[in-house]
């Protein structure tokens, strides 16, 4: 689905009109309508303010994918996903346990240049399990934001400040 249609869906999920959104961001209602109906492409420099103006968790995933392509985490909403918070919590636990099991099976004592092709394939498998766990966790955060009315922007702002305070990041 196009990013314009994703913006329209996100705006509707949040109960925001085009007029209301246009008052929050530097875009006219008419331009928003053209972006949403694909008569115009959303300029890259407006994507951040539109996404933050709507503050819809699923839209953040779509914009991330649009900006980074293959190196992004998708929102887990497929046919086999139950988006109830309790179900998502169990999925996180399952995927995390799978990732830890794969990590435990690796030969951590060997330098990477000494690894066989089979061991490297095992590392790739572990990395895919880590991505599954990460995706399930990110999707749980999105579901919890929706369910409890939290701003995903505010959750991430607070988290990033806490990372800097704990010296996990440098900026």
Task: Put a short name on every predicted segment.
Residues 108-171:
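Charged, low-complexity intrinsically disordered regulatory/assembly segments
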Residues 1, 11-13, 41:
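Short amphipathic helical patch at the helix-1/turn junction of helix-turn-helix
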Residues 67-135:
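Helix-turn-helix/homeodomain-like alpha-helical modules used for DNA recognition
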Residues 7, 33, 50-51:
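Short amphipathic alpha-helical segments
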Residues 5-21:
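Short basic helix-loop element that most often maps to the first helix and adjoining turn
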């Amino acid at each position: 689905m196009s990013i314009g249609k994703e913006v329209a869906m996100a705006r509707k999920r949040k109960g925001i009109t085009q007029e209301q959104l246009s008052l929050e961001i530097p875009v006219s209602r008419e331009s928003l309508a053209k972006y949403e109906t694909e008569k115009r492409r959303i300029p890259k420099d407006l994507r951040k303010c539109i996404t933050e103006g709507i503050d819809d968790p699923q839209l953040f995933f779509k914009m991330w994918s649009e900006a980074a392509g293959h190196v992004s985490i998708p929102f887990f909403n497929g046919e086999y996903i139950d988006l109830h918070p309790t179900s998502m919590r169990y999925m996180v636990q399952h995927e995390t346990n799978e990732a830890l099991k794969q990590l435990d099976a690796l030969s951590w004592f060997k330098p990477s240049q000494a690894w066989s092709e089979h061991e490297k394939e095992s590392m790739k498998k572990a990395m895919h399990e880590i991505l599954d766990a990460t995706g399930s966790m990110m999707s749980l955060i999105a579901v919890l934001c929706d369910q409890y009315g939290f701003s995903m922007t505010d959750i991430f702002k607070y988290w990033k400040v806490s990372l800097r305070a704990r010296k996990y990041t440098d900026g």
